[in-house]
Amino acid sequence: MWERIFLAAALALMITLILGPLMIPVLRVMKFGQTIREEGPKRHLAKAGTPTMGGIIFLVGIVVSALIMAEKPTSLEMVMVISAMLGYGLIGFIDDFIKVVLHRSLGLRAYQKLIGQIALALLLTWGANRYLGRGTDLVIPFTSIHLELGLFYYPFVSFIIVGITNAVNLTDGLDGLAAGTTLFSMLSYVSIATLAASQGGGVAILAYESDLAVFAAAAVGGCFGFLRFNKNPARVFMGDTGSLALGGALVGLAVLTKTELILLIIGGVYVVEAISVILQVFSYQTTGKRIFRMSPLHHHFELGGWNEWKVVMVFWLASLLCGVLGVIAYMAGMF
C-alpha cells in the first residue's frame, strides 16, 4: 500500500510539473488574467493579469495519478471522492469563466453558487450512506463516541461541506497560501485513510479504503508541484477552479472516512479565515466598525506590515499543526 501511496504523490507531482509550463502560456494567450481588488493591499495590484484558472494543471495530475495508482480505480470510494473534487471544481470553473472570459466581475451570483454547492453536498452525503454504508452518525473527535443524527445528518454535514469548500476559496488570497495549506491537510488524510485501511479506525471500512490514501497522496503531489508556479511571485493562480476543487477533495475524504468533525480541526486555518470574514461583515453592518484591517485574516497581517511570504509561512505552519492535531484526534478514537 505504501508503495502505491508514494508513487501516487510522485506521479501527480511529475504530471503537474510537466503541465505547468505547457498550460501557463496557453492561459496567458487566452487572456485568462486575474482581476485584483482595488481595495486590497496595494502591492497586489502588480499581480493584475497573472493567468488564473491554473487549478486545471494540478487537477489533471491528481486525477490521472489517483486512477493509475488505485487498487481499483472504479471503486465507489474513488469515484465519489474524485466526483466531489471535480464537481466543486466545475462550479469554480464556471465562476472563473464568467469573471475572466465574459468579464462579469462577480462571476456566478451567490445564490447560484450556493445552490450548486448544497446539491453536491447532499449528493455526497446521501451517496456515502446509501451505497457505502457510512451511516448518519458523527464521530466525536478524540473519542470513539458516535453521535447518531438520523436525517439531521444531511443538512448538518452539508453545512460543514459548503462552509469548508468556501473557506478554502477564501484562503486562496496570497501566492502559495491555499496550495500549501491544503498540502498539509492532505498529508493528514494520507495518514487517516491509511490507518482506516489497515486498522479500521472504529468505523465501517469497505474494500479499497486504501485508495482514499492514494487519492490524498496524489493531491499532496499535485499541490506540491503547483507551488513551483504559484509560490511568490506567482506565475499562475489556481482560481476558483482550483480552490473549490481542493475544498471538494477535502470534504469528500472527510465524509468517506467519517471524519466530518475532525475536518474542522485539520482545516483549522480555513475555519479561522472564514470566521474572520463573518465577524468582519457582522461588525461592520451592526456597528460600522471593522475588527480586522481587512478580511480574510491573511490580509489583516499583510496590512499590519508582514510581507506576503511571512504570512504564507506562518499559515503553512498553522496548517501543519492543525493537521497533526487532527490525526491525533482520529487516533485517539481508535483505542
UniProtKB/Swiss-Prot annotation:
EC number: 2.7.8.13
Recorded coiled-coil stretches: none
Keywords, alphabetical: Cell cycle, Cell division, Cell membrane, Cell shape, Cell wall biogenesis/degradation, Magnesium, Membrane, Metal-binding, Peptidoglycan synthesis, Transferase, Transmembrane, Transmembrane helix
Gene Ontology CC terms: plasma membrane
Designated name of the protein: Phospho-N-acetylmuramoyl-pentapeptide-transferase
Transmembrane segments: 5-25, 50-70, 78-98, 114-133, 145-165, 177-197, 200-220, 236-256, 262-282, 311-331
First-listed, main subcellular location of the protein, grouped into a coarse class: membrane
Cofactor(s) the protein needs: Mg(2+)
Annotated source species: Desulfitobacterium hafniense (strain DSM 10664 / DCB-2)
Family from the record: Belongs to the glycosyltransferase 4 family. MraY subfamily.
Catalytic activity: UDP-N-acetyl-alpha-D-muramoyl-L-alanyl-gamma-D-glutamyl-meso-2,6-diaminopimeloyl-D-alanyl-D-alanine + di-trans,octa-cis-undecaprenyl phosphate = di-trans,octa-cis-undecaprenyl diphospho-N-acetyl-alpha-D-muramoyl-L-alanyl-D-glutamyl-meso-2,6-diaminopimeloyl-D-alanyl-D-alanine + UMP
